[in-house]
Swiss-Prot record:
Keyword Kinase: no
Official protein name in the record: Elongation factor 4
Organism encoding this protein: Xanthomonas oryzae pv. oryzae (strain PXO99A)
Domain tr-type G: 2-184
UniProt xrefs under InterPro entries: EF-4 (IPR006297), EFG_III/V (IPR035647), EFG_V-like (IPR000640), EFTu-like_2 (IPR004161), G_TR_CS (IPR031157), LepA_C_sf (IPR038363), LepA_CTD (IPR013842), LepA_IV (IPR035654)
Classification lineage: Bacteria, Pseudomonadati, Pseudomonadota, Gammaproteobacteria, Lysobacterales
EC numbers: 3.6.5.n1
GO molecular function: GTP binding; GTPase activity; guanosine tetraphosphate binding; ribosome binding; translation elongation factor activity
Keyword Nucleotide-binding among UniProt keywords: yes
Gene Ontology CC: plasma membrane
Known function: Required for accurate and efficient protein synthesis under certain stress conditions. May act as a fidelity factor of the translation reaction, by catalyzing a one-codon backward translocation of tRNAs on improperly translocated ribosomes. Back-translocation proceeds from a post-translocation (POST) complex to a pre-translocation (PRE) complex, thus giving elongation factor G a second chance to translocate the tRNAs correctly. Binds to ribosomes in a GTP-dependent manner.
Amino acid sequence: MRNIRNFSIIAHVDHGKSTLADRIIQLCGGLQAREMEAQVLDSNPIERERGITIKAQSVSLPYTAKDGQVYHLNFIDTPGHVDFSYEVSRSLAACEGALLVVDAAQGVEAQSVANCYTAVEQGLEVVPVLNKIDLPTADVDRAKAEIEAVIGIDAEDAVAVSAKTGLNIDLVLEAIVHRIPPPTPRDTDKLQALIIDSWFDNYLGVVSLVRVMQGEIKPGSKILVMSTGRTHLVDKVGVFTPKRKELSALGAGEVGWINASIKDVHGAPVGDTLTLAADPAPHALPGFQEMQPRVFAGLFPVDAEDYPDLREALDKLRLNDAALRFEPESSEAMGFGFRCGFLGMLHMEIVQERLEREYNLNLISTAPTVVYEVLKTDGSVIPMDNPSKLPPLNNVEEIREPIIRANILTPPDYVGNIITLCEEKRGSQIGINYLGSQVQISYELPMAEVVLDFFDKLKSVSRGYASLDYHFLRFDPGPFVRVDTLINGDKVDALSIIVHRSYADRRGRELCEKMKDLIPRQMFDVAIQAAVGSQIISRSTVKAMRKNVLAKCYGGDVSRKKKLLEKQKEGKKRMKQVGRVEIPQEAFLAVLQMDK
């Protein structure tokens, strides 16, 4: 155990952690030069296209240090986007140290601050690394000063590297060996292993990535999953180098994969503890906190026959994505589907993209909404993630919305624009700190305002320089109403939205105008109305197409023409009573693009 080092890399999006990982793998001889490709650990095609890391990945590498000893480096790559912060907390729980990678040209950004605090809270040794020093705009001294001012850790010994050119990567490895402590033995000698991640393999069943805290796991031993109480027989164990390599055992302090022929998707929950069935550990490891989904949306198959396939696909994704929640839902407008919970809009986009690509599903998604708390008149509090499930208003005492604390880091030039944006979004300012060349702005904002398009607007008002990190604070009561959309007098449940009362008229008007452009013309007038309760607040009409029934009458008696027009009017009236209006997918997305 003395020569094992477990570490992860934390950084903001685009500060170069996957490239640094590539260089570390190359220098330790994990892959031959011909097998190397850029971002070797970002294995998912969506990760490679968007240039972001979504899933944490792990590699075990042997490294011969300058003192002649061979060290085993277990390295877990982590994502940088705020939506995937739960992946980071999970990876950090399995490590003793972390490399904090900061772009020397851009300086400290909000997500690296948040992840660094998580690492310090978990008692990890943080080693600062300044990347991209080959750029002409890199300023190492300023970046060091920012790390000390914004994060508050000593950056005097920060290693300055260029991951792209490979400069000083050997110094990073020496810093890992000498500054990150080895795993400490636990107070029990019984097997305890933390499940960091699980995924489904078509041939092997469930494969789990584990960090062995104490004891050892061998093929043939019977393990117990502590939360479910089920036992499984271990088939194979091994490590990633980054290729999958089988071993005879995984010992204390090591990070590797195990395959215990678990065929059930929920057999190895992430964050759970494994122990030996014959000689179990007295208690489970303190896992990381369960992430609560913050954004909910309905996912419905375009073809109703795909419903079982969608359920199976979500089950498999859930194994690999601990924060995804879903439950069956039926909608009058859309048929059968699932109500899914996500961590944020990027998470939602990526889940939908993975379902469509990896499982060949054609999906419709409804407008995303946050979770509100509803206090009923009988004193009970219920969570509400679907506007159409709001109880009748005479049973509702108050509606509470989720409030978040946002930390924004920005250059001083854009402070005015950002404050204006936050005020527009009903924010209340907590404080402003000037830290060297950066300004830290803290705001309390309603989550509903942040989730949809706040991130995009923040980037545009600051020309891409501001960065955002947020965490949930509390629920606050407010004057909220539900705006329903009626098409020809029928309520469309999938288009209901919850808004602040002061915005209801404007949102209703915008929604009606948007829908008018999107619903195709029929042979009869289509009335689109927005209503709060029984009061109609806005209306627009899609005019009917008209067939010229008088075309065949050349001159002649006017009563003949009247008769034909009356007949047409009767037919339209009858058609309107039985006619159904098809609502296209774009109409459901119109709710999203209201402010644009």
